[in-house]
Amino acid sequence: MNNNINNPLTDVFQKEGTSSIIGGNTPFLLDDPDAVWYVRSGQVEIFSVNVREHHQTGARYHFFTAQAGDILLGIDLEKTSMEIGFLAVGLIDTEIYKISSGRFRELAENPGNISYAAKLLDKWIEGLSYGISKDINTHTDLLIEPVDEMEVEDGNIIRSKKGVAWTSYAEGNTLFIGMEEVGIEGAKALVPVTQDTWLQTIGRTRLSVVNTEVPLTNGDIWQGLVDFHKLLFQCEFMNIRLAEVDEFNRLKTKADYETTAREEALSQLVSVLQCEGAQETFSGDHADKLFMSAWEVCHAMGISIKAPPKSKNTNVNSVSSATAAIV
């Protein structure tokens, strides 16, 4: 059972939020930055999808599963500028509650709610982190935990020892899951890493590590989440494009195989039905394997067949032409 169900913040969702019963026939995009959803019962499957004008296009790629007690954050897709978003699809009779992100932020920053809000946000970050890294993995050089400052040599792979660890940099930079630089020159980088995701240092790097409660207390977490979502979509954009290329190659290989198999089958049919002493040969436009196969079958049955006249229509059905030529 998810411990977040006993989180006092979730009571506010149920008292103040708008309730909805969702299922597989009511998917919705998490593209409203002014909304936060709480999963009261059931579960919600989260997919990454291409988005055009606030509508899903193309295939769905499963990201992670949100359980009862979890929250879902709306994301401003204009700030990510990648034409990618998250689609939420509930199991039948899943119950969710929605409140405004402003109200959630107000509740989360209340000193008495910091630890509870941190648990809710950690579950969201861990779900996204699992989704972006579930198909790739690498070794780990160093497990990190909260510390004022630490130095890591160039090229090291670091992960969180436990839970969500937020990293910030005094020197150097890192690659998120080996794909995207996390730092922006002249800007403060605050990046979460979990046991599923990793950071690879670029040059000698000095960084500090804190848990989620620290940026929640000072308010830095909200911009950190915006940057994290953008970082995820940059990586997922590449993942989706690679998946589309793989699917194209799979279909092309399948089509090539079917063509080869069909040609081999026709060749085998001709070779099996060839009669010793048959002298008639075919050339030019009539030397196709389908007509040759038809001729061999008819010859064995004592039926005469002649090649059909060449059609001006290049799309003429060759099966119809062959059968029409039986006399």
State where each predicted segment sits.
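Cytosolic regulatory regions built on CNB/CRP/Popeye-like sensor folds
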Residues: 1-327
